[in-house]
């Protein structure tokens, strides 16, 4: 269940990221950790790699933006990172960027059982996610897809 402050914090994070040449990928608030942790994932708007220095440099402005809004009333740790291998693909841009990369698709079959299919990502459209599995195209109904995750080339 998402944290109740997520709808208030997300626009602050998105606008702060945009002001510094980044795009907000994801934000999570982990309250099971002490102190709670706010995880912010960013990527460059020009598509180039995000460096450790970029993350460190963005931490200050992001922390200041959160503090100025006074939304978090308890101590927290702010973590800035970028998506990497093993991350779930979510946006249309993710699916375009990682076309032909090895992925694992988690989906529900016609009987409602969870299934996993590994292969090279071909595309995601309004109806299907298409994966190349050893030279054969596997079409999985988009409505059945639970997640699509990057995997290492060896599986």
From Swiss-Prot:
Transmembrane segments: none annotated. GO terms for biological process: ribosomal small subunit assembly; translation. InterPro entries: Ribosome_maturation_RimP (IPR003728), RimP_N (IPR028989), RimP_N_sf (IPR035956). It holds the Pfam family RimP_N. One of its GO terms (cellular component) is cytosol. Signal peptide: none annotated. Keywords: Cytoplasm, Ribosome biogenesis. It is found in: Cytoplasm. NCBIfam families: PRK14634.1. Required for maturation of 30S ribosomal subunits. Belongs to the RimP family. HAMAP family: RimP. This is Ribosome maturation factor RimP. It comes from Synechococcus sp. (strain WH7803). The gene is rimP.
């Amino acid at each position: 269940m998402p944290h109740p402050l997520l709808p208030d914090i997300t626009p602050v994070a998105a606008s702060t990221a945009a002001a510094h040449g980044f795009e907000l990928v994801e934000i999570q608030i982990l309250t099971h950790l002490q102190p709670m942790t706010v995880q912010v994932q960013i990527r460059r708007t020009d598509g180039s790699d995000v460096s450790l220095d970029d993350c460190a440099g963005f931490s200050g402005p992001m922390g200041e933006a959160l503090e100025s809004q006074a939304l978090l009333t308890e101590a927290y740790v702010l973590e800035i990172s970028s998506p990497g291998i093993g991350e779930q693909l979510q946006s249309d841009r993710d699916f375009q960027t990682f076309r032909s990369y090895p992925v694992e698709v988690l989906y529900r079959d016609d009987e409602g059982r969870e299934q996993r299919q590994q292969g090279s990502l071909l595309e995601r459209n309004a109806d299907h996610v298409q994966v190349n599995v050893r030279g054969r195209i596997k079409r999985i109904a988009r409505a059945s897809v639970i997640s699509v995750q990057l995997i290492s080339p060896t599986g």
